[in-house]
């Protein structure tokens, strides 16, 4: 036996850490076995060496695992030796005291446990404490704190009778002045615990200690709180302590004397837990505050303070507004006395209690208080911070989700309080966050919390994981869905956190996360290293199935704490009373009979072991720790959450789970992800026993009509209804007569129970077992239930929820916001999710959903988080489908959001849904979107050139088709023309093809009158002509040719005139194309019916009356050549109807083929009787006419007045006949009966161009006018430089200048190429700007401006400088033209100040100076103010200098009005780090003073004394240098 003991000693004394870890468990087993270690008690020397080795080498090891093993071995020795271990206490105590200050929480806790065990089994507590008193003066603050905690634990475990407290209290009093706050807090808690056991004598004795009165007050307040709580141990036995007995006297107190009158109640049977648990449980309801230490507050303190405010009354909304404005004024200025600020915060609570939330304007004013709340939360006065936190908590608890904006705004500020060393501030912040998390379930709070989980502060990280755990316990699953990935990533980081307590909290979070999203949790689990996986499992095991306890009772301490928890933790969000807790759970077990459930939301296999015998596939064994628990254990009960009870949701027992234990409802979106891993409960939020399908009717009564067989046939789908996690009432055919009650807390659920009782937490309200329906086993369920087919129409949905339509009418037709405190109106409500109700193609009955707040939907759409944008789009779809029209302001904001969404990077997730929403939006609001059409059309066309998935591209095409059919054709056409010539756009080949195809399809539907020969049209047509020779793409070439032919066919006369105005090269290209087209079409020899096939009839057939008249006499019904060309199917014998039958000509190709091919040979003309000679003569006529027209059009341009005089002379008859003016001398030719449409075209080209258009437009033709409707559109919608001819009139333009400018523009469009040529072009343009060529500017100004601004980004600095010089010259000569482009020009000019080349900067400064003197002062200042406030150096400097020049031009009255906008930016500039910016700001202020004088002074109140002195100095200097000063206070005034 002797050698065995020596070998143990050798193993203990070895230094190798690995071997120690191996032999540790063996030593424990050896010492625990009395037979093997019989020699342990015989050799005292060996035992001494053994214990000494354990104490010095193991317990003092640097490896915490060795330390824990050493303690376990000592614990085994204590158990083995009992009181014989007393001799070793002196050996081990120094090491154990040191370990009380260990950095590892697990080491400290095990150390406490071992010490308590020694006191319990080896020696009496006083013996041990006599040797531990030195720990109160230990150099490690954690050790000093640990000693206090150990004392508390000893008092709880052994009682006060076993200790001579008179020896200990002085040491505790010394620690009250400890430099470390945690030690001070622990000391106070120790005194409180002594008071709890001993009674009032402690108060009297402490008064004799000479402690500072402030410290005594804090301690005595704690004493009073404990006394009021009813947790006193010795209150009944206080008479046993004589007056002369003292806990601090020279002789032992009666509590510690052996002859104590109080009976010694043995407390050794108390289960030994961690010190923190013992402490928190013993202090009852004050546990959290006591745990935090002196000055700390908890939720109960907050709840008491909610009502502890003066009573006020609100008489009107005006009264409320005035009160809040006063409060805001006080809170926004920290110069007010702190007591005033505290009273103001209390008054907010008073207003809330007086019913402020019932007033409409309250929430508007509440938003304005955000800044004041932030300031209060940052206050240096702890009392102000405390009141601010209490007020925020009160707002959250009263307003619920309506406090979303305030909560989101203030949360980051509150987080900054957590690491504060002042406990009152830190704990106030913590409690405020907890209250907000409990009551305001806004998904936007999740990123705020998760971002702080990676804080550098350990305290913040710990708290954040606590908050996350609370959030996962309290919130509904749908509120978490959009942040699944963020939550998983945060929990993963927490599990790897450097701090042990943070890791523990993160592991709790993991299991909370698992209860919501089992699949993601399993995925996360498998990504962890094995050691972390073991830690997660051990956390579950060590918690003694505490994870599976009902949520209302889950805590880190004994059940006493949960009984004494603050009321707020137990009440429902609506303020109802405490939940029924575990008693309900117990009752429900008996009620449900055999339906005892396992913890299936943790264990994916648990459903298989439940009594319902549901077959399911096996999940990961890693999560099966709860599966083996007996049916009657806590784990077999449903999880009753305080805030998430299921009052009877139905679960499809037979839904087939996948390998991850989740129902395979594939069409269900992410928003329908199951909270439970249990296949049988995959659609539900809670695991309450009453949740199984067999549950019958609430109260036993049927609430809806039986489901008919037809509807039953359509509803075999695991589709949620209203509640995105609940299954359909009629998924199982047998439940057809039941109306399954659902928890009213889940979004979109039926309101069959009243609002007052909607939070009923009973898990079993009259549910019956499955056997009642014969559904005890899954085999009895029809196989068709598992088919899981998808509902595709709204009728399916209506049938599936026929009973839901019986809900009270009151709830269906409520206006917005009436019940927005209800969860169904939260921004995360599953009513937002269309997929949570029906398939994408299915309609959603709008009366089945609570409509969402439009502002909330728009906020989601504008979010930077893609999942929130997706949620917003779903909400918007619901709004649009419910025929909810948007206001003008909402429309404007939504258009801005949609404009940004065109560039959304999440194409599959968000952009696809955006396109679907866009189509609905266009259809409903097309009449209000005219101003946004340019952006819509151009962005969609750009998207056609992007690399998109086929499905997404199809949606873009659909959006284009809807756009084409929804807006006026002429407006679309003009936008496309403008887009083509826009120099800022560089469309790729795909975009070009998309544009051309769109124009071609548009041309087939346009009226001839819609084609307008404007400058943009001519420029666009010339560009399209160049595209017909695109070398890189045959698709572009073909599409461009088809567009030219389509436009020619659309309005031959006007298009011919347009060609005549183009340069010769363009004419030749187009004429050649048209010749070939006509030649090819004539060679086909078919009388093409494409007049009705290749061309889609106009939406207004009645307006097809010929828009042009010819001087010729039509012998066939007076039909115009244009009409003959475009619409004749039967030759000239009769005008055909718009929709001729394609089968009128048997040899014609099929309708479908012709429509698809867009073949030029199939366009609209009739060649039935043409021979080749006539064709070529006609072609020659067309060519000659174009050439002649190019000269005539120039003559016409020189006679604008004459043309106007002719305007009324052209008379157009309804049948297409015309009376030509007598003065018209140009060759009108007669058309004989045998001549064809082509000759009519030729003859038309030989006539005088001017014609009056009939119908709505009633305008004459001229080559340069632009559509009036488009002008209006441009002014209102397009701030950027687009081609707006609002000032366009006919001018006398010399032909050489027009051609020259066109060539220059073409040259300038070669960006970053041909540097020398472009320099020459810019110099030439510089000359033209100095000449008085008004016509050039009328036609080309916008194109020139755009090209110049684009050239400012050129690679060559000399080009950039030259462009600025040209721009400056145009500003000098044409200032009025910049009115609509001021913002763009100013921005580009100011940005040029950042250039690295001095030459460019100098040119930019000159241009800015000219801008300041050219543009209207008020307009200029409105553009400059935001730039000054937001831009960085040097742009802000240039803007301030420019503003200074503008101020010198402005009138006093105008400047006074704009002062509110100007001053903030200048004051900001006065504080700038750049001295030049500060100087410029001062000069600008001086210039303002020169204009308005002393009126400036009130706006400078924020300036410090030194800055005011400096400003006054400059003002005086300016006054003295200006001899023309009108007065001492006004240096100069400018009108």
Curated annotation (Swiss-Prot):
**HEAT repeat spans:** 87-124, 163-200, 405-440, 441-477, 971-1008, 1339-1376, 1457-1494
Which intervals of the chain are annotated as region Interaction with microtubules, MAPRE1 and MAPRE3?
A: 662-782
Residues with Phosphoserine modification? 246, 545, 548, 558-559, 568, 600, 636, 646-647, 649, 684, 688, 695, 702, 711, 784, 794, 820, 1088, 1110, 1193, 1220
Residue spans with biased composition (Polar residues)?
267-279, 645-658, 721-730, 1079-1094
One MF term in the entry's GO annotations: microtubule binding
Q: Which InterPro entries match?
A: ARM-like (IPR011989), ARM-type_fold (IPR016024), CLASP_N_dom (IPR024395), HEAT_type_2 (IPR021133), TOG (IPR034085), XMAP215_CLASP_TOG (IPR048491)
Q: What is its main location?
A: cytoplasm
Q: Where in the cell is it found?
A: Cytoplasm, Cytoskeleton; Cytoplasm, Cytoskeleton, Microtubule organizing center, Centrosome; Chromosome, Centromere, Kinetochore; Cytoplasm, Cytoskeleton, Spindle
Q: Ranges of Low complexity compositional bias?
A: 252-266, 280-290, 548-567, 579-594, 612-633, 673-695, 1103-1112
How does this protein assemble? Interacts with ERC1, MAPRE1, MAPRE3, microtubules, and PHLDB2. The interaction with ERC1 may be mediated by PHLDB2. Interacts with GCC2; recruits CLASP1 to Golgi membranes. Interacts with CLIP2 and RSN. Interacts with MACF1. Interacts with mtcl2 and MTCL1.
| Protein known as | CLIP-associating protein 1
> Gene encoding this chain?
Clasp1
